[in-house]
């Protein structure tokens, strides 16, 4: 029996424990069922879930639960992305250990990560997440690293991995190279410096504009637009760099924007991506002036050792003293920063480094072609990936100068030859393990270990292969082959908008190269979570809300409904009032089933399911089955927001406020046949509503199932039942019109009782309902209206009522007539009382009424009086209400 009060903190942990103990969500390969494998995002092991995780993973959970109910063999694992700089920083801070002790450092990284995993797994379970935890994976596991390394060996065999010096995105704060996907432009305030560069022949100056005067020692050319009349005559000449006394050429190129600054810019190696393009296009020299730590090197001359910002300020001061800096303009411009990590956000430098690359640019067209074969939800998210792919300037930098990461399965010799690991030795760590050979097999040179580790996206970009056991299948394992063939390509990749250009793009690339296939059939994209104020959640804004603040107060199910209300692909603000509303809705659901329990728990629905029902029963079941159809269509498209709103509205208003209230008199009445029909409809309605709600709010529906339905049905969990069956024979448009009419009439009668201070169960002695077109429908529900509203005498009359409106009182507006007529006011009041109808008629016809009081002329307009009218029917005073073509007369 359901307890009196809904307490999510009581019921939710109970069912979470039950699901784990009973292995309700255990995956068993069943080749007789259609596969549905979900390539779930492995969150970075920070130790805590934020609301973004709750939103994305609740969406995934809704899909998994729904697909299980549809009869799919749902493969639903969950992994954790372990490697990365944040863990290294945490270990350095908490344990006081440095990367100079790599073996000990790695042990501490693993130790800290396990603690984070345990905490996050508990949080996942607390939101009702139904993954099969026996399939949990971690990117730091040896078998996972072996799979990653095996994938790289395959890439190497295909000639897709190489090592060379190339300008890379470098974070001076994190001291590592980054992929393009890890950096982004941030608009901020800065300065544009206008500098006169002397021509080498002494004939004058060319003015350039730059935001980075500190890069002057790295200047290798000055560029102008070929059609710029101001500078055409200077192309081919040289400038002499002030301070550094070095000559560089003036060149013309169409990439120059003549409207920016002075229309002339200097090319430094490297200030931005355009500098790289020009340097390669014109085979210009490379001069590097910035160290890995963000200080100026010896090539900066007198500015060596200064930090970048210090050098910028000092060189600007020196140029100003020389009379060459003639303007400093405050501007808004875009600065390239380490945007992937909000705790860093340091400006990025472009430094040439020996790095490892995966060839991507040559595969762009193929990647886009494969991406097109995938169903994107929403569709326009495909364009984000396409635009990103087409904008790539160079290949994917996969090496990172860190410690805690998957090692490269390579050694190198001093001549640059690559020595791959043997497949049977994987996983290997060249930092600690011996190479497969003593000397380079190509040139005989000494072999050195590759000490870099892999970009984290190299780990996570093979998750669809990991969960489908590709790494075991390619070794010849027969069981793994079956698993792989049944589940790959996976059915779904769920992820956020923020990682389309990283996780989605790299996964398509990697799985296509390794298998020749797309990684998934569908991809569904959720937006980001904003704070209650609509801005991005940030500690600096003070608008961060954690799941731990919400769940103890409202429970996981109420929070899950908030996630389900998020529109596909759009950002979704967290709103306390929304969660509160959801909680009150769940209380309403609880009360519905508490009421119904005594009527349907022991009822034999199967015996009577096909009896001829009454009009209101047909109405509510027609509405139910329309919603079953709509819910199925929406969930197949991975759209939750519209069906969630529809379900809440339907259950709260049509089911609770209307239908149940309109059948109570039948359930408690003496007409056994009518009572039985009401129970048939109520059972079918509430059983299916429970199933519709189950993927969204799994805890409350499990409690309801065990209290009311389990004894008869026998299945261990509501989540092992089948999705509601849509019955076309239940759709009845005429019944829906009748039901809607009943709702409106009952609503008007409730308003009448409320306006008279009457309780809703108060008896009404006499009500007449007049109708023309709706007469026949009203006759069918006459007993329902009378029973619901407790009407002693209800008449349904075809036609229009004979109503007479009478003026019963006319009162003066004292604020108006008081100042005008003073002592005459009492006599005016008496006159109005005696001549009410004629006064009102005269004002209506002439706009004013004129009469004399004590010999003085009085003039009144409609602003001077208040008229009270009453309606009479057959001489008896009545009140009326109108609904469509129906007039309700209350006697």
Swiss-Prot record:
The keyword Protein biosynthesis applies. It comes from the Archaea. Coiled coil: none annotated. It catalyses: tRNA(Val) + L-valine + ATP = L-valyl-tRNA(Val) + AMP + diphosphate. One of its GO terms (molecular function) is ATP binding. It is found in: Cytoplasm. GO terms for cellular component: cytosol. A motif ('HIGH' region) lies at residues 43-53. ATP binds at residue 539. One of its GO terms (biological process) is valyl-tRNA aminoacylation. Pfam families: Anticodon_1 (PF08264), DUF5915 (PF19302), tRNA-synt_1 (PF00133). Keywords: Aminoacyl-tRNA synthetase, ATP-binding, Cytoplasm, Ligase, Nucleotide-binding, Protein biosynthesis. InterPro entries: aa-tRNA-synth_I_CS, aa-tRNA-synth_Ia, Anticodon_Ia_Val, M/V/L/I-tRNA-synth_anticd-bd, Rossmann-like_a/b/a_fold, tRNAsynth_Ia_anticodon-bd, Val/Leu/Ile-tRNA-synth_edit, Valine-tRNA_ligase_type_2. Catalyzes the attachment of valine to tRNA(Val). As ValRS can inadvertently accommodate and process structurally similar amino acids such as threonine, to avoid such errors, it has a 'posttransfer' editing activity that hydrolyzes mischarged Thr-tRNA(Val) in a tRNA-dependent manner. Belongs to the class-I aminoacyl-tRNA synthetase family. ValS type 2 subfamily. PANTHER family: VALINE--TRNA LIGASE, CHLOROPLASTIC_MITOCHONDRIAL 2, VALYL-TRNA SYNTHETASES. NCBIfam families: PRK13208.1, valS. This is Valine--tRNA ligase. It comes from Pyrococcus horikoshii (strain ATCC 700860 / DSM 12428 / JCM 9974 / NBRC 100139 / OT-3). The gene is valS.
């Amino acid at each position: 029996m359901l307890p009196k009060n809904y307490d999510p903190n009581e019921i939710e942990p109970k069912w979470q424990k039950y699901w784990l103990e009973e292995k309700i969500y255990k995956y068993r390969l069943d080749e007789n069922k259609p596969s549905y494998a979900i390539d779930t995002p492995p969150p970075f092991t920070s130790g805590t879930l934020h609301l973004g995780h709750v939103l994305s993973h609740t969406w995934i959970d809704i899909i998994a639960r729904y697909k299980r109910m549809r009869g799919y063999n749902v493969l639903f694992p969950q992994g954790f992305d372990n490697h990365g700089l944040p863990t290294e920083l945490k270990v350095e801070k908490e344990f006081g250990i440095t990367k100079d002790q790599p073996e000990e450092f790695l042990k501490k990284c693993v130790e800290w990560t396990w603690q984070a995993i345990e905490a996050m797994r508990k949080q996942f379970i607390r939101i009702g997440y139904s993954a099969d935890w026996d399939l949990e994976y971690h990117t730091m596991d040896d078998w996972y690293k072996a799979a990653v390394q095996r994938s790289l060996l395959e890439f190497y065999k295909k000639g897709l991995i190489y090592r060379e010096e190339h300008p890379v995105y470098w974070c001076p704060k994190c001291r590592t190279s980054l992929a393009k996907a890890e950096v982004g432009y941030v608009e901020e305030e800065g300065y544009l410096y206008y500098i006169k560069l002397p021509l080498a022949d002494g004939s004058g100056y060319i003015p350039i504009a730059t935001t980075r005067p500190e890069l002057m020692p790295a200047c290798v050319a000055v560029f102008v637009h070929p059609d710029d009349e101001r500078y055409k005559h200077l192309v081919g000449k040289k400038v002499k760099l002030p301070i550094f006394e070095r000559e560089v050429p003036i060149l013309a190129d169409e990439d120059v924007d003549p409207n920016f600054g002075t229309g002339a810019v200097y090319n430094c190696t490297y200030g931005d991506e355009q500098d790289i393009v020009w340097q390669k296009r014109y085979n210009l020299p490379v001069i590097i002036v910035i160290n890995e730590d963000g200080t100026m090197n010896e090539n900066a001359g007198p500015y060596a050792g200064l930090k970048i910002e210090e050098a910028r300020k000092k060189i600007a001061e020196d140029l100003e003293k020389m009379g060459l800096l003639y303007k400093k303009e405050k501007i808004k411009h875009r600065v390239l920063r380490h945007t992937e990590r909000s705790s860093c956000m340091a400006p990025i430098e472009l430094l040439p480094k020996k790095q490892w690359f995966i060839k991507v640019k040559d595969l762009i067209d193929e990647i886009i072609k494969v991406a097109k074969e995938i169903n994107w939800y929403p569709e326009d998210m495909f364009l984000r990936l396409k635009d990103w792919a087409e904008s790539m300037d160079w290949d994917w930098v996969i090496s990172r100068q860190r410690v805690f990461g998957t090692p490269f399965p390579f050694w190198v010799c001093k001549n640059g030859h690559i020595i791959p690991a043997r497949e049977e030795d994987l996983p290997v760590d060249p930092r600690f393990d011996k190479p497969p050979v003593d000397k380079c097999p190509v040139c005989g040179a000494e072999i050195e270990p590759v000490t870099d580790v892999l970009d984290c996206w190299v780990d996570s970009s093979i998750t669809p292969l990991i969960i489908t056991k590709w790494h075991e299948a390619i070794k010849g394992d027969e069981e793994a082959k079956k698993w792989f063939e049944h589940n790959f390509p996976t059915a779904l990749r769920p992820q956020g908008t923020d990682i389309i250009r990283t996780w989605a793009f790299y996964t398509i690339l990697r799985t296509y190269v390794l298998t020749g296939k797309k990684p998934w059939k569908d991809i569904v994209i959720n937006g980001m979570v904003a704070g209650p104020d609509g801005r991005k959640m940030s500690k600096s804004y003070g608008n961060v809300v954690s799941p731990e603040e919400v769940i103890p107060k409202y429970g996981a199910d109420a929070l899950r409904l908030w996630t389900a209300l998020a529109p596909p692909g759009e950002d979704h603000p967290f709103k306390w009032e929304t969660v509160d509303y959801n909680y009150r809705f769940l209380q309403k659901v609880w009360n519905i089933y508490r009421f119904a329990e005594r009527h349907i728990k022991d009822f034999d629905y199967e015996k009577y399911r096909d009896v001829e029902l009454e009009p209101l029963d047909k109405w509510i079941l027609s509405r139910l089955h329309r919603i079953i159809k709509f819910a199925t269509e929406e969930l197949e498209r991975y759209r939750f927001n519209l069906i969630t709103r529809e379900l809440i509205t339907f259950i709260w208003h049509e089911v609770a406020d209307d239908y149940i209230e309109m059948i109570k008199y039948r359930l408690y009445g003496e007409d056994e046949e009518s009572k039985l029909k009401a129970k048939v409809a109520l059972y079918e309605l509430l059983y299916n509503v429970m199933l519709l709600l189950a993927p969204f709010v799994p805890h409350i529906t499990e409690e309801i199932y065990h209290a009311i339905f389990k004894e008869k049905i026998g299945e261990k969990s509501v989540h092992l039942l089948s999705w509601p069956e849509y019955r076309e024979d239940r759709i009845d448009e005429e019944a829906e019109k009748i039901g809607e009419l009943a709702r409106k009439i009952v609503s008007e009668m409730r308003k009448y009782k409320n306006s008279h201070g009457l309780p809703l169960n108060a008896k009404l002695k006499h009500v007449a309902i007049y109708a023309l077109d709706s007469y026949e429908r009203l006759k069918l529900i006459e007993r329902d209206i009378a029973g619901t509203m407790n009407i002693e005498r209800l008449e349904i009359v075809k036609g229009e009522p004979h109503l007479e409106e009478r003026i019963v009182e006319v009162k003066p507006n004292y604020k108006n007539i008081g100042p005008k007529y003073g002592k005459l006011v009492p006599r005016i009041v008496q006159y109005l009382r005696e001549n009410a109808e004629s006064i009102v008629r005269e004002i209506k016809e002439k706009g004013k009424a004129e009469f004399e009081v004590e010999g003085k002329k009085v003039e009144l307009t409609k602003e001077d009086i208040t008229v009270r009218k009453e309606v009479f029917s057959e001489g008896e005073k009545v009140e009326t209400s109108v609904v469509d073509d129906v007039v309700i007369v209350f006697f």
